Amino acid sequence: MRGRSYTPSPPRGYGRRGRSPSPRGRYGGRSRDLPTSLLVRNLRHDCRQEDLRKSFEQFGPVKDIYLPRDYYTGDPRGFGFVQFMDPADAADAKHHMDGYLLLGRELTVVFAEENRKKPTEMRARERGGGRFRDRRRTPPRYYSRSRSPPPRRGRSRSRSGDYYSPPPRRHHPRSISPREERYDGRRSYSRSPASDGSRGRSLTPVRGKSRSLSPSPRRSISRSPRRSRSPSPKRNRSVSPRRSISRSPRRSRSPRRSRRSYTPEPARSRSQSPHGGQYDEDRSPSQ
């Protein structure tokens, strides 16, 4: 039964055996895909390529060693790349050299993400990296530039905000005062309300506060300007001309028409009846 239970395994193993002829390294996978370059960190700035070559050639032939430097200053960055000919040698060197003391510093050795490239390509990377760094550094510059626009943004927001909201409230009474001057139509009153307008300007925020706090100041504040401003011109204009206009035509029309209508009627009646008698009496003695 055990022999029969293992019969299906050979086809599975056969598929695996079909992959086995491909070259493989010690740590599995194809040797072509395995990394051959190591990234060595925590190097001293005075470390040279010869120092790394002596310590890493113990594990196999070294193809290339590269110590990158800063593109702008030329100072070493404190790490380097060691590339081996065989990926197995690179794996042994990583295993033994990780934590190794070189020139008084403990090294950290890991596989590089990509195999070591030419120095020209690395320089191009450095330039590109510098650009990327500049781009990374530029956001603070943009932020610094954006520090100047915040007043703009603040202004746009402050129009609806609290900091710049009082000026428009102050401007409203200013716009109302000339309107009141227009309605009054008198320049003499336009100057005197200037003081009242200044009081009104001081009172306008109080009105806003009184509206939010209590309804009583509304009545006291709203009635005082209405009594002082509105009735004075209305009484002068409406009462005086109406009385003068209404009384004069009514008196002139009604009594005059009545006198004229009633006076000539008796005159005509008297003149018609006695005219004959008078003329007869006058004629009689004259003749």
Curated annotation (Swiss-Prot):
Modification after translation (UniProt): Phosphorylated by AFC2.
A Gene Ontology biological process term: mRNA splicing, via spliceosome
Gene Ontology MF term list: identical protein binding; RNA binding
Listed Basic residues bias regions: 220-237, 244-260
Pfam families recorded: RRM_1
Residue span, RRM domain: 36-114
GO cellular component: cytoplasm; interchromatin granule; nuclear speck; nucleolus; plasma membrane; spliceosomal complex
Biased composition (Basic and acidic residues): 116-132, 177-187, 278-287
Keywords noted in UniProt: Cytoplasm, mRNA processing, mRNA splicing, Nucleus, Phosphoprotein, RNA-binding, Spliceosome
SMART domains attached to this UniProt entry: RRM
UniProt keyword Phosphoprotein present: yes
Region described as Disordered: 1-34, 116-287
Tissue: Ubiquitous. Mostly expressed in roots, fruits and flowers, and, to a lower extent, in leaves.
UniProt entry tagged with the keyword Protease: no
Note: The splicing pattern of the pre-mRNA is regulated in a tissue-specific manner and by development, and changes in response to various types of abiotic stresses and hormones.
Similarity remark: Belongs to the splicing factor SR family. SCL subfamily.
Protein name: Serine/arginine-rich SC35-like splicing factor SCL33
Organism whose genome encodes this protein: Arabidopsis thaliana (Mouse-ear cress)
Gene from which the chain derives: SCL33
